[in-house]
Amino acid sequence: MTQRKTLLLCKWEHDLLETLLDSGNDVILVLDDFDAEHHHLEPKLIDRTARVYRVSSFDALSDLSAVAADIRLREEKIDQVISFTEFSQLGAGYLQSLVVEQPKDLLDWVAVRDKRLMKERVRAAGIRTAISLSLPDSGDRERREYIKKTLRFPVVVKPALGFGTMSTRRADTPEQFDAILDDFHYEPLVPSRQLTVEEFVTGRELLVEGLWVNGEPEFFVAGSYLEPRLASIGSRSGDTEQLPDGAVLLLREENAQLYERLLDFCRRVNAAFHVTDAVTEVELFETPDGELVFSEMCTRLGGGAVVPMVSEHLGEPVWHIIGRGLLSGEARPREVVRRYVGFVNLVPEKPGVITSLPPVDEVAAIPGVARVWPVAKVGDALSLSHGAEFCYIVIFGSDDRDEFDAAMERVMTEYHVVSTPAGTADSTSAR
């Protein structure tokens, strides 16, 4: 008989929480203010947990310390701390260092968040990645001069502990580099003001989602962005033709050699961070000469449309698969249900207030469309400044390649999100 465990789950995720509770284990839930204010917390699930702690955020050490102290006072044994978002990764690492009997090295948790330490570890493992330098203070003129003399332009400037492409800028010249830093904009969600600067890498941008149990993949799915993320985001100013924002999953049987290379690549990346049992996303580039270049990794799935896209591919909510795998090591999903899967995120041509969205029922009725997810609504203001600003997501899924391609092409060409500058009105149709 499997021994009953006590699990500490950080943040709200319905499907994952449900799977953990259905396993018969005790689940202690830690929620932050964002969870309470923005998620529909289901009382029936909440009532099944051992108890719930509330913290202001997972960056608040005093709140997390109080949670750990209460657990210690109860003399409870916590078998596993589970975190699935970047917003809770550092806090979860801190908690497990205080409440788990044999905690993982806290620096391992930091290394999958801080991009400077991340790339240092990857380089030490012999994996190619962009040359990069730390910029702890954007106003440090001496350090900036050193960076300009050392790195080859263009370069990418981004927060060392950022989220996706928030506050990420490309500088093509030393002069542009200085101009960006003289007036650097930090998105509100970016917690640290320290930056990293790295040389720009060209090529096809890939993403790899995996669940690892005892060092082996329970699922391993690779995809390719329609356009490199920075190029897509950079085209949103309205001054140039807008590039599509989306991705397609790559079938293993059609890309067997690439999958073999990616599996070896990700095993080496995991080893650099001592990852054996975790969910991971690895982003990388395939250069024009075919070389794989590491970009970033995290111990969570990709954001935005990645979770529903992978779920569509595997035929069930991916959090159910992850929950089973992390608990029992037996999570192998069923055979791929949808062979061809992808997504696009429709955004307005220019920043502003949304005045019209494509009709959901009409888009959903297109053969090859699996799901329509209008993240934003009419009246919302979009800055279009980073890739985590999702607007109108369409998930595609089909066993027929022609149907799949036709659906993606039709949605991207026939349907549009319309916006106007703040303070104006417009009733233009979204189609």
Which residues make up each language-model segment?
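Active-site nucleotide/adenylate-binding loops and adjacent lid/helix of ATP-dependent enzymes
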Residues: 114-196, 201-202, 213-214, 250-264, ...
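Short beta->alpha connector loops
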Residues: 9-15, 33-34, 87, 136-139, ...
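Short, well-ordered beta-strand elements within core beta-sheets of diverse protein domains
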Residues: 169, 199, 250, 311, ...
